[in-house]
């Protein structure tokens, strides 16, 4: 048990999926896991452990933003020995060829700042995914026939941005989408020699203004969860 996770050490699997939304964690566990049991509800941040095709997996909510994710990822790694951490969540599309409902598999995550920024000082550390997980996710996405993009994303530290020039530079440099957590997850995984990946569903588009209707989100997000689970145990 930690400050933010109330589970016993034996209740958390070595493979953890991390949606930001705790209700999405509950939905994913009920939909895709066998024998899912609630293992955490501290501060309403729900976590469940069950099995997927015989493999033990935990789905733990992480909240919004890098500071929140950093708390849960740190505790999962240091106190529960999590070895594989996969963020599953939504993002905003940034490139014209990236459409709402598409899935982005994040090869790298650019950020201006993160909870780890103070460690690097003048160094611009490049947070990247674990290659084996990345390759397995691409294979799983192709097998499902899911429209998928692989490349860099932008992890912002604000949701209501006041710097449109930053978005312009991200688009100019080929960034596929924007979210708020992956850069810190990749940094922590590198520091602790763990496997990490972010798989994201494009729920809205910054250029077109298109947004995914609420009734379509469940099925679209389901593709993302299945890709993550298949990649984790490939």
From Swiss-Prot:
Pfam families named among the record's database cross-references: PNP_UDP_1
Domain of life per record: Bacteria
| Residues where a purine D-ribonucleoside binds | 4, 162, 179-181, 203-204
Locate the site labelled Important for catalytic activity.
Answer: 217
Q: Which residues bind phosphate?
A: 20, 24, 43, 87-90
Enumerate the active-site residues: 204
The main enzyme category here is transferase
Does the record carry Transferase as a key word? yes
What is one GO biological process annotated to this record? purine nucleoside catabolic process
Show the GO MF annotations: purine-nucleoside phosphorylase activity
- Keyword Transferase among record annotations: yes
Q: What is its EC number?
A: 2.4.2.1
Report the catalytic activity.
Answer: a purine D-ribonucleoside + phosphate = a purine nucleobase + alpha-D-ribose 1-phosphate; a purine 2'-deoxy-D-ribonucleoside + phosphate = a purine nucleobase + 2-deoxy-alpha-D-ribose 1-phosphate
Similarity section: Belongs to the PNP/UDP phosphorylase family.
Role noted for this protein: Catalyzes the reversible phosphorolytic breakdown of the N-glycosidic bond in the beta-(deoxy)ribonucleoside molecules, with the formation of the corresponding free purine bases and pentose-1-phosphate.
- Stored HAMAP family: Pur_nucleosid_phosp
What is the name attached to this protein's record? Purine nucleoside phosphorylase DeoD-type
């Amino acid at each position: 048990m930690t400050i933010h996770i109330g589970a016993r050490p034996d209740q958390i699997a070595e493979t953890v999926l991390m949606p930001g939304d705790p209700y999405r964690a509950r939905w994913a566990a009920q939909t895709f896991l066998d024998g899912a049991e609630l293992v955490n509800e501290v501060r309403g941040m729900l976590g469940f452990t069950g099995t997927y095709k015989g493999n033990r997996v935990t789905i733990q909510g992480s909240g919004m933003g890098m500071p929140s994710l950093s708390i849960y990822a740190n505790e999962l790694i240091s106190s529960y020995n999590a070895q594989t951490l996969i963020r599953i969540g939504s993002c905003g599309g940034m490139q014209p060829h990236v459409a709402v409902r598409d899935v982005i598999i994040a090869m790298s995550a650019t950020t201006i700042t993160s909870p780890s920024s103070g460690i690097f000082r003048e160094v611009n550390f490049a947070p990247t995914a674990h290659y084996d997980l990345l390759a397995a996710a691409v294979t799983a996405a192709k097998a499902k026939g899911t429209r998928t993009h692989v490349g860099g994303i932008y992890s912002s530290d604000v949701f209501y941005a006041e710097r449109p020039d930053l978005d312009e530079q991200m688009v100019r440099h080929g960034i596929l989408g924007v979210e708020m957590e992956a850069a810190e997850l990749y940094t922590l995984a590198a520091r602790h020699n763990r496997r990490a990946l972010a798989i994201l569903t494009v729920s809205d588009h910054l250029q077109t203004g298109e947004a995914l209707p609420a009734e379509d989100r469940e099925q679209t997000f389901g593709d993302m969860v299945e890709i993550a689970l298949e990649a984790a145990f490939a």
